[in-house]
Each structure stands twice: as C-alpha cells, then as structure tokens.
C-alpha cells in the first residue's frame, strides 16, 4: 500500500472459527501505517460451493483471500479456483503443516477446529474469568455457593484483582465486601469454611491505599473512606465475620497480588 487512500479487503476463510487467520492478518496489517484494510471473516467453510462464492466476491472486490483450511481437498480447490479467477491468496497454515510433515514424517489429522476441541483449559479459563466478573463485589450471592473460592474482606484488600488473577488459573472465584452497615449474605455461612479466604490488612497500609485512591478520583483525602478510625472499625467488623465463618485469613499488607494468589491457590489445592 503506497498511500493512505488505497483500500484492501481481505476475506479470511477458515474451516473453523477463523480466529487464527485473523490474528495473523491483523499482525501483518499493523506493520503498515495509514493502511486502509477491511477484514471480513468467513468461518466454518466446508464445501466447494461456499468457496466458489467467496472467490467470485473477492474477484469483483479485487480482494485478498487469507485462509486456514486443513482438509487438503478443500484447500486445493480454493487455490485452484482463486488462480483461475486471478484472485491473490495467502495460505496461512498449509506451509506449516507441510514443513512439520517433512521434518517429522508425521501425518496431520486434517480435522478442522482441533485447537478449540483439544484446548479444554482455554475454555475453563474463559469460564472462570466470566465467573469472576459476574460475581464480583458481592453483586450476586448465588456465586458464593457456585464458586471454588470465596474471598472476603474490606474495600481495597485486592479482592477483585485476586479474583481475576486466580481466574487465569482456571479457578472460579467470588468475592464479598465486608461493610459494618451491611449484613453479610447468609450463603457465606452455608459453605465450607475451607473454600472461604479472609483478607486482612494493617490500618496504616489501608489508610495509605485509600488516600491514594481518593486522590486518583479527585476527592479530598479527609473523606470518611480513608479515616483511620473508620478503617479500624471496618477491620474489626471484618475480623468478627471471618471468625464467625472460621475461614483461613491472609495478611495482604505487604504482599503483591501474585504472591497472595499463589498462597490462595496452594491452600485450595491442599483442600
């Protein structure tokens, strides 16, 4: 692309979702400043009729076809059809399959979508991340029952970032804020105390964190949220709830999120 006005349409054809091809094309496009490229994904292409339609559309639009087709018959048909129609193509996965075959003498399975069917961990991770968002900050007490781990503590004890971090370890985490004026959900006392983790913090550390939070929001640091007496009241209340739940407690005063998450993960595995 020699100037900013040239426009290119790229049809991304795949016998699966098409995410792999799209990511590769996006990575390539990012190398061209001022480029005008439109990506159009066409997933789950498994028949020659669809390929013929795409090739003709691409011919009229003077477009490029980038594809990931693992079935040789379908891949060859696309290449032949595109060549006959003078449509440019990029085979993203074919050369890699051929090279691996040459170097290992192993034969591909030629099954579309295997990366998604085999990668169960990927889906568990996505499910856990969605769970953490849905049951963040005590917004739905049903999450307490469904969760692998429940985090409880006062505001600014890293409950949300911990929930997200642990979700990437495929753990479903709900978190519940403890506030003196709000009765904790009854579900908290129905679950095993072993799957509940209390987070405590020193008053001074929490005061510092909340003061910085208020500054970031453009609010006065004298607000009750960062008042040391109020903080002590909240922490005392939280301790009573944790004692009542009889759950293990982690002091997060001087711990990074990663360190605390690893501790929680280890405790969960032991249980």
UniProtKB/Swiss-Prot annotation:
Keywords, comma-separated and alphabetical: Kinase, Nucleotide-binding, Serine/threonine-protein kinase, Transferase
Residues reported to bind ADP: 153-160
One MF annotation (Gene Ontology) recorded for this entry: phosphotransferase activity, phosphate group as acceptor
Keyword presence, Kinase: yes
InterPro entries found in the cross-reference section: Kinase-pyrophosphorylase, PPDK_reg
EC identifiers of the protein: 2.7.11.32, 2.7.4.27
Catalytic activity: N(tele)-phospho-L-histidyl/L-threonyl-[pyruvate, phosphate dikinase] + ADP = N(tele)-phospho-L-histidyl/O-phospho-L-threonyl-[pyruvate, phosphate dikinase] + AMP + H(+); N(tele)-phospho-L-histidyl/O-phospho-L-threonyl-[pyruvate, phosphate dikinase] + phosphate + H(+) = N(tele)-phospho-L-histidyl/L-threonyl-[pyruvate, phosphate dikinase] + diphosphate
Keyword Nucleotide-binding among UniProt keywords: yes
HAMAP family named in the record: PDRP
Sequence similarity: Belongs to the pyruvate, phosphate/water dikinase regulatory protein family. PDRP subfamily.
NCBIfam families given in the database record: PRK05339.1 (NF003742)
Function statement: Bifunctional serine/threonine kinase and phosphorylase involved in the regulation of the pyruvate, phosphate dikinase (PPDK) by catalyzing its phosphorylation/dephosphorylation.
Protein name: Putative pyruvate, phosphate dikinase regulatory protein
């Amino acid at each position: 692309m020699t100037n900013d006005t040239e426009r290119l349409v790229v049809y991304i054809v795949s016998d699966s979702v098409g995410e792999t091809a799209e990511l590769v094309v996006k990575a390539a496009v990012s190398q061209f400043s001022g480029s005008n490229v439109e990506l159009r994904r066409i997933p789950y292409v498994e028949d020659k009729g669809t390929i013929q339609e795409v090739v003709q559309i691409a011919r009229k639009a003077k477009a490029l076809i980038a594809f990931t087709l693992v079935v040789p018959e379908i891949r060859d048909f696309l290449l032949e059809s595109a060549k006959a129609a003078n449509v440019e193509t990029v085979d993203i996965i074919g050369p890699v399959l051929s090279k691996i075959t040459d170097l290992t003498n192993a034969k591909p399975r030629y099954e579309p979508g295997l990366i998604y069917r085999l990668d169960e961990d990927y889906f568990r991770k996505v499910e856990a991340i969605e769970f953490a968002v849905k049951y963040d900050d005590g917004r739905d007490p049903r999450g307490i029952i469904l969760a692998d781990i429940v985090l409880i503590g006062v505001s600014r004890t890293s409950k949300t970032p911990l929930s997200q971090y642990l979700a990437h370890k495929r753990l479903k985490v709900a978190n519940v804020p403890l506030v003196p004026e709000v009765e904790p959900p009854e579900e908290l006392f129905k679950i095993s105390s072993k799957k509940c983790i209390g987070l405590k913090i020193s008053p001074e550390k929490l005061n510092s964190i909340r003061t910085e939070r208020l500054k970031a929001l453009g609010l006065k640091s004298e607000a009750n949220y960062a008042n040391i007496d109020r903080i002590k009241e909240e922490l005392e209340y939280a301790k009573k709830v944790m004692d009542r739940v009889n759950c293990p407690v982690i002091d997060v005063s001087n711990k990074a999120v990663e360190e605390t998450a690893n501790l929680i993960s280890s405790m969960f595995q032991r249980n």
